């Protein structure tokens, strides 16, 4: 796993870098685990833009990923390590002894031919899945469930890992990559290890076109718009009109708390960005 850079034959090529994809062992995905995926262009069912600056991009097929890891006690062998256009991490194809095939997020260091297991008796090694109850404190984990049986929702991006800090009663304290420490029930599952493709953060797109390939359209600042389009638009030169920076709908963008989920506030032991 490394990064390729290129001779500066053009201004874009000067800062252009890509993964060397050396860990990839197969080009064509498993057909039985593919689904058609249609692009929304950031529009909802009414055709209105709900997510700005989205659209275009290369056509992709969705790989069905097993985030639940619910084949308990059934060993599986790693058949391939593959590229997934829908996420930053690599994925691994598992062949279970009962004949079933499933994709999982590939942890860092996973090799073809390794045997993985989802069980309370599984070894503490990358790729194995256990409930937090049977994972020792200090272990690096990813693909962490928030609700028992729902499947992993936390810590799934390339190169990230959470750390199991401590256990208290029915809950474990997990330190997330953001620095937040959160309580998660001991019956929730997690996978051992760090997510693969840790060099992803060091890749430079190099040119605007690569953003377009990913379905990202140009992002325009509010201060450059007309007053009809944004509260901070208009004026001769750059001027905010005297108001604080805000979104197109008037919501303050500097320091305003937007989280509105009191039901799970008690699960946050320490918020991200706090010292001590």
UniProtKB/Swiss-Prot annotation:
Gene Ontology MF: a single term: transferase activity
Compositionally biased tracts (Polar residues): 34-49
Spans traversing the lipid bilayer: none
UniProt-listed SMART domains: Ribosomal_L2 (SM01383), Ribosomal_L2_C (SM01382)
GO cellular component: large ribosomal subunit
Name of the protein this chain belongs to: Large ribosomal subunit protein uL2
Pfam families per the UniProt record, alphabetical: Ribosomal_L2, Ribosomal_L2_C
A GO biological-process term: cytoplasmic translation
Swiss-Prot/TrEMBL keywords: Ribonucleoprotein, Ribosomal protein, RNA-binding, rRNA-binding
Known partners and oligomeric status: Part of the 50S ribosomal subunit. Forms a bridge to the 30S subunit in the 70S ribosome.
Function in brief: One of the primary rRNA binding proteins. Required for association of the 30S and 50S subunits to form the 70S ribosome, for tRNA binding and peptide bond formation. It has been suggested to have peptidyltransferase activity; this is somewhat controversial. Makes several contacts with the 16S rRNA in the 70S ribosome.
HAMAP family per record: Ribosomal_uL2_B
Superkingdom: Bacteria
Similarity section: Belongs to the universal ribosomal protein uL2 family.
Renumbered residue ranges of the record's region Disordered: 29-54, 212-258
């Amino acid at each position: 796993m490394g990064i390729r850079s290129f001779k500066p034959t053009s201004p874009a090529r000067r800062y252009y870098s890509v993964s060397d994809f050396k860990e990839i062992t197969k080009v064509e995905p498993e057909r039985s685990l593919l689904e058609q995926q249609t692009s929304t262009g950031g529009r909802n069912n009414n055709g209105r833009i709900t997510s700005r600056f989205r659209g275009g991009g290369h056509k992709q097929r969705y790989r069905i990923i097993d985030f639940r890891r619910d084949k308990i006690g059934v060993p599986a062998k790693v058949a391939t390590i593959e590229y997934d256009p829908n996420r930053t991490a690599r994925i691994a194809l598992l062949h279970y002894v009962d004949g079933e095939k499933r994709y999982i997020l590939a942890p860092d260091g996973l090799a073809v031919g390794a045997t993985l297991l989802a069980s309370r008796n599984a070894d503490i090694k990358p790729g194995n899945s256990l409930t937090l109850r049977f994972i020792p404190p200090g272990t690096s984990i990813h693909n962490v469930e928030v609700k028992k049986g729902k499947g992993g929702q936390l810590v799934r991006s390339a190169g990230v890992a959470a750390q199991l800090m401590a256990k208290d009663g029915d809950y474990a304290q997990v330190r997330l990559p953001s620095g937040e420490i959160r309580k998660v029930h001991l019956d929730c599952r997690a996978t051992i290890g760090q997510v693969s493709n840790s060099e992803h953060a060091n890749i430079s797109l190099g040119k605007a076109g690569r953003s377009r390939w990913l379905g990202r359209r140009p992002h325009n600042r509010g201060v450059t718009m007309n007053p009809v389009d944004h509260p901070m638009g208009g004026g001769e030169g750059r001027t905010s009109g005297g108001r604080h920076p805000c979104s197109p709908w008037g919501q303050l963008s500097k320091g305003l708390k937007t989280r509105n989920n009191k039901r799970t506030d008690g699960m946050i032991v320490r918020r991200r960005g706090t010292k001590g």
